[in-house]
Amino acid sequence: MSEVAETWVDTWMAKLVNYDYKHFIRLVIIVGGYLLLRNIASRELAKKQLAAQVEKDKRDKEEKRSKDLIDKPDDAATAETTSFGWGKKTRRRVKRQQELFENALEEAKRRNQGLDPDSDADIEELLEE
């Protein structure tokens, strides 16, 4: 061992030998209290972290649910139509597909009305009175 280590060990051994029961009890109380408070604090922090994680998961789940409840026309157009069922989900899907089909028909009619060859609507704005 080095000279510094020997000096350090000798110093601590001398201090421990000179301690009486009162000092040892005090040391045990301090160390025991530290360990007890540390365990309690770590448990409480773990509870807070778990509660925060549960709250975050609830918010994420609610946000996902609200996004799922919003009708997305693109999703309905690409949805699979091969499966047929009798439940509420199938009825909603069929209703959504019917609405999309009706909207597509109305838009096609509007486009065709503007392209009617017998219509003078496209040249009316060019005519001067």
UniProtKB/Swiss-Prot annotation:
Identify its membrane topology class: Single-pass membrane protein
Modified residues annotated as Phosphoserine in this record: 119
Residues bearing N-acetylserine are 2
The segment annotated Disordered runs over 53-92, 106-129
Basic and acidic residues compositional bias, start-end:
54-75
According to the UniProt entry, the coiled-coil residues are 43-116
Protein origin, superkingdom:
Eukaryota
Task: Name one cellular component (GO) term.
Answer: endoplasmic reticulum
Q: Look up the record and give one Gene Ontology term from the biological process aspect.
A: protein transport
Keyword terms: Acetylation, Coiled coil, Endoplasmic reticulum, Membrane, Nucleus, Phosphoprotein, Protein transport, Transmembrane, Transmembrane helix, Transport
What is an example of a Pfam family matching this protein? PGA2
Carries keyword Membrane? Answer: yes
The entry's localization annotation reads: Endoplasmic reticulum membrane; Nucleus membrane
Transmembrane regions listed in the UniProt entry: 23-42
Record's compositionally biased regions (Acidic residues):
117-129
Q: Which family does it belong to?
A: Belongs to the PGA2 family.
Q: Which PANTHER family match?
A: PROCESSING OF GAS1 AND ALP PROTEIN 2
What name is this protein filed under?
Answer: Processing of GAS1 and ALP protein 2
Q: Which organism is it from?
A: Saccharomyces cerevisiae (strain ATCC 204508 / S288c) (Baker's yeast)
Q: Specify the taxonomic lineage.
A: Eukaryota, Fungi, Dikarya, Ascomycota, Saccharomycotina
